[in-house]
Regions:
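Low-complexity, glycine/alanine/valine/leucine- and proline-rich hydrophobic stretches
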Residues: 155-194
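Divalent metal-dependent catalytic cores for phosphoryl transfer on phosphate-bearing substrates
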Residues: 26-30, 39, 45-165
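Generic alpha-helical secondary structure
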Residues: 40, 142-145, 185-192
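Cytosolic transmitter module of two-component histidine kinases
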Residues: 35-37
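Core structural elements
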Residues: 2-10, 70-76, 165-172
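Oxyanion-binding/catalytic loops of NTP- or PPi-dependent enzymes
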Residues: 1-16, 45-48
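Long, charged amphipathic helices and adjacent flexible linkers at domain junctions
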Residues: 9-32
Length: 194
């Protein structure tokens, strides 16, 4: 029993170490590719709050939460290659990137998740062809969360300081206050929630 408790403690410590260092590496990579840190930090904050609120519905674990976090940080990296085809550029950059403590399969999950947005979530089929059925379902869930989070900062001006979330039956209600114009965010939010 003592060995199991120690092993569990060590595993949790190791997972925290991996998550911290993988996120640090992703931020360094995002800086290299000229990603806007205020934007990706806002998207991260929103996405992780949504992930945590929907945990009972999506059933994904902490490792999948880390994949979502890294995808949020790096979702704009493809603009470095081509601003007109940034999603494909993001996929190409990330699919072969080695992330600290993660497997090649997990890098592919990050690449596929990061290379979607509210307008192209369904259109990108090639990345999904490289995934198992189980991982396709995981990525679909993560993409949906990322799209909603990205829509909340579509203008990349961090218009919402905080959001609050309420789960009512199977519906997620997002509350956000601001005195700024949020027409673009409302439009993008509508695109990814219909």
């Amino acid at each position: 029993l003592m060995v199991q408790l120690l092993l569990k403690s060590e595993k949790n410590s190791y997972e925290e170490h991996v998550a911290k260092n993988a996120a640090s590496c992703a931020r360094a990579l995002a800086k290299h590719y000229g990603c806007d840190s205020k934007h990706y930090e806002a998207v991260c904050k929103y996405a992780l709050a949504i992930f945590d609120k929907l945990k009972k519905l999506h059933g994904l674990n902490a490792r999948r939460r880390l994949i979502l976090e890294l995808a949020c940080i790096l979702h704009e990296s493809g603009s470095f290659i081509n601003t007109h085809h940034k999603l494909l550029g993001t996929y190409d950059i990330l699919k072969n990137t080695e992330f600290y403590g993660l497997t090649a399969e997990e890098s592919l999950l990050i690449a596929t998740t990061a290379s979607t947005d509210e307008m192209h979530m369904i259109d990108i089929t090639e990345p999904f062809e490289n995934l198992s059925h189980k991982n396709s379902l995981v990525v679909t869930k993560l993409c949906t969360i990322l799209c909603v989070a990205n829509a909340l900062d579509k203008s990349q001006n961090c218009k919402f300081d905080n959001i609050s979330l309420k789960l009512k039956e199977n519906e997620l209600i997002v509350y956000a206050e601001t005195d700024k114009n949020v027409h673009l965010e409302k439009w993008a939010f509508g695109e990814c929630t219909t």
